[in-house]
């Protein structure tokens, strides 16, 4: 039994657009992560990712330019870009780099909530404040992005009617741990790059 290899026209028409599509998914996903690393001051990782992003982009665009008569390479290039943005955001959500500040405002007594947050290892600042309807408790806690669901679970369990906002934190003082848990590789790299 012999297999016939596809001719150049078949390769150019079908296989090349597929390769361009996947190359764009990879380079745009890398670009999304690179931008996030730049925002988080992870300069070394941003540089390495930038190198591979541009290398893959040059390879993809050169194939499009060499095959200007194949409209499928244009479509693959654009679809790869769109898909790469989506995949890049999914990857970023999965690795969840960085810290967040959760601001909780509640009219209900927040003693139980703050105690559970402290027991879970989160630093908590609890202030008396005054809102439109009277006295409120204002609670601040800084957590890693991957731990925000845990914090919100506690808020909903102990103060289900509390109002909360979540914001990105660019920098957390090194000697104050966000959560005293085992650090992953990205956390260790971020701490090393700040020094």
Curated annotation (Swiss-Prot):
Protein name, per record: UPF0316 protein Pcar_2434
Lineage: Bacteria, Pseudomonadati, Thermodesulfobacteriota, Desulfuromonadia, Desulfuromonadales
HAMAP family the record matches: UPF0316
Residue spans crossing the bilayer: 13-33, 45-65, 71-91
Keyword Cell membrane: yes
Pfam families from the UniProt entry: DUF2179, DUF5698
Membrane-topology annotation of the record: Multi-pass membrane protein
GO cellular component, one term: plasma membrane
Alphabetical UniProt keywords: Cell membrane, Membrane, Transmembrane, Transmembrane helix
InterPro entries: DUF2179 (IPR019264), DUF5698 (IPR044035), N-reg_PII/ATP_PRibTrfase_C (IPR015867), UPF0316 (IPR022930)
Protein location: Cell membrane
